[in-house]
């Protein structure tokens, strides 16, 4: 296993409440913001977090391996200033067969995403997906250290799956819209229609009821 060169984040970003400007990435799926000069490289044998093999202040898809001749780590920044995303993309990584994952840093929100993107039907990743602050503080996705892929083999984003990490204290009541599931093209003569969608609960309290408003073509909210 090896580390990449030190890379610069192309916008202001805070990790665990503190500003960070640079990172490096291991060929075993670990991105670290600290001790950039000479940290030991984590091996491909992943484990539950926290783990002493992982440097402080790290994000990881630990357990994938950049051992193939066409296994690469690519970076690209998307969006406009103020709301950009910086993607660190593990392409064609080895996990039984080819496997694609990304770590994403988001400007403005300081959110971190781990994106499960695309896999061969023969791939069998068993990864630790999460964040380690130090030797005693870490969080990992349920299922780690044997977290399997959810995304299929499509090169399109339609079957991608992601895990979102938000800094701060969890609100008791919080929700976000995921999708509008009503068919986008409707014949008015067939009205009335049922407006449907999906929401996700981001709060600690169970949601038992809510008010939902919507507008059509910029009209008054209903």
Predicted regions and their residues:
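Extracytoplasmic Ser/Thr/Pro-rich, glycosylation-prone low-complexity segments
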Residues: 1-173
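Extracellular/luminal regions of secreted and cell-surface proteins that mediate adhesion/ECM remodeling
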Residues: 169-222
